[in-house]
Design a protein with these regions (language model features):
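A generic local secondary-structure boundary/capping motif
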Residues: 15-18, 38-42, 69-72, 92-93, ...
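Active-site cofactor/cluster-binding pocket
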Residues: 6-66
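Low-complexity, flexible helical/coil segments
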Residues: 24-27, 48-50, 62-69, 84-92, ...
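Short alpha-helices
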Residues: 55-126
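Structural signal for conserved beta-strand scaffold positions within catalytic alpha/beta enzyme cores
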Residues: 12, 29, 52, 69-72, ...
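Glycine-rich loops and low-complexity Gly/Arg-rich segments
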Residues: 11-15, 51-56, 74-79, 131-133, ...
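Short, low-complexity, polar/charged sequence segments that are solvent-exposed and flexible
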Residues: 7-9, 30-31, 46-49, 70-73, ...
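Hydrophobic helix-and-loop "lid/oligomerization" segment in the mid-to-C-terminal part
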Residues: 1-7, 18-25, 104, 108, ...
Length: 207
C-alpha cells in the first residue's frame, strides 16, 4: 500500500539499513515483542536503543530492557497503540491523511472491521483518526484484492480441513509465495464461517 500510494520513500531494503546506523539510532519494534518474529532479527543486535509497541500476550523469549515499552494485550491492535501514543502527546503530532488511513486500516484488519476485540478506546482512537480525514471508505480501497491475490486466498480457504470439532487448518500451495496480509484475509474468511472457532493458516512468505 505504501508503494502504490507514492510513499515508497518510507521503505528501505533490509540490506541497505546498516549504512544508516549510528550511536543515536532508535529501533522501534511494532506488533511483536519477540526477537525471533522480527523481519530482520539480525538488526536487533546492531542497535542499543530499542522501543517495543505490541498488543500480543507476552510469551517466552521476549525482548529485554527496551528504553521504552508499551505492551497492552487488551488493545485491539498495534495501530491502536500507536494512535494512542500520538494523541496523548503534550504537543500536537502532525499526521497526514494517508498515514491516518494506514493506522485505521491496521485497526480494521485486527478487529475485522470492528466486529471483534474492540473496546471503547478502540472506537475513540478510530474517531481521533477521523479528525485527520481517515475513513473506512479509504480503508476498503486498500483491502480490495487484486485478481491474483484473490485466487491465492480462495485456494487457501478451499484447502481448509477439520483438525478437531471447530478447529481447522488451511494451507497454500508449496510453490506459492503468500503475503501475511493474504494469510490474514484467508483466516478471517474461514473464521466467518458458522461453527469455526479457530483456524491455523500456513503458507510460505518472502521471509
Amino acid at each position: 500500500h505504501l508503494i502504490s500510494n507514492g510513499l515508497d520513500n518510507l521503505l528501505i531494503e533490509p540490506d541497505d539499513v546498516y549504512e544508516y546506523l549510528g550511536e543515536k539510532t532508535l529501533l522501534v519494534i511494532v506488533d511483536t515483542h519477540r526477537q525471533s518474529f522480527l523481519e530482520t532479527p539480525e538488526l536487533f543486535d546492531k542497535v542499543d536503543r530499542i522501543v517495543v509497541i505490541d498488543h500480543h500476550r507476552k510469551g517466552a523469549h521476549f525482548i529485554n530492557n527496551p528504553i521504552f515499552q508499551y505492551h497492552e494485550p487488551q488493545s485491539s491492535s498495534a495501530s491502536e497503540l500507536v494512535t494512542e501514543l500520538i494523541f496523548y502527546q503534550t504537543s500536537k503530532v502532525n499526521v497526514s491523511e494517508q498515514v491516518a488511513n494506514f493506522l485505521l486500516s491496521g485497526i480494521c484488519l485486527d478487529t475485522k472491521f470492528f466486529k471483534s476485540g474492540v473496546s471503547g478506546k478502540t472506537f475513540e482512537m478510530a474517531m481521533n483518526l477521523k479528525n485527520y480525514q481517515a475513513s473506512v471508505e479509504a480503508v476498503n480501497e486498500y483491502f480490495k484484492e487484486e485478481y491474483e491475490e484473490m485466487k491465492l486466498i480462495s485456494g487457501i480457504v478451499n484447502s481448509a480441513k477439520v483438525l478437531s470439532p471447530g478447529i481447522f487448518m488451511a494451507t497454500s500451495d508449496e510453490e506459492d509465495i503468500i503475503t501475511r496480509t493474504a494469510l490474514s484475509k484467508a483466516a478471517e474468511e474461514i473464521l466467518s464461517t458458522k461453527g469455526v472457532q479457530a483456524v491455523f493458516v500456513v503458507g510460505r512468505t518472502n521471509n
